[in-house]
Amino acid sequence: MKISVGNDIVENARIRDLLEKHGDRFLKRIFSESEREYCSNRKDPVPHLSGRFCVKEAFIKAIEPKVVLDMREIELFGKEFGKKELVLHGKSKELFLTKGYNGCSVSISHAENYSTAVVVLYKE
């Protein structure tokens, strides 16, 4: 079995600043419609946006750090306290399949000031 690991951490204030400065333009550039909807229904959407941002960055680091991918093609789904699942589209999915990966695990955490994520890609 071969695995590839990516991780990321972001200061929640950084995402809050981007959201205040660029608003919908920032959201629509990074997050899918379903991700935006999920986060907007939270008391404070910023930690949830930050965590999803980290997942996208961690996926890119795990699959190919030098490649440019549309972050909206990397979607995080799952219950609030349940198992998370990545759903890939377009070039992200194509790259995942081309490299022969057949599985992915995601871990995401939030704290008051930071959000972090780890993505593990694997092929058997």
Swiss-Prot record:
Mg(2+) binds at D8, E57. Its main location: cytoplasm. Pfam families: ACPS (PF01648). Its EC number is 2.7.8.7. Coiled coil: none annotated. One of its GO terms (molecular function) is magnesium ion binding. Gene3D superfamilies: 4'-phosphopantetheinyl transferase domain (3.90.470.20). GO terms for cellular component: cytoplasm. Its cofactor is Mg(2+). HAMAP family: AcpS (MF_00101). Belongs to the P-Pant transferase superfamily. AcpS family. Transfers the 4'-phosphopantetheine moiety from coenzyme A to a Ser of acyl-carrier-protein. This is Holo-[acyl-carrier-protein] synthase. It comes from Leptospira borgpetersenii serovar Hardjo-bovis (strain JB197). The gene is acpS.
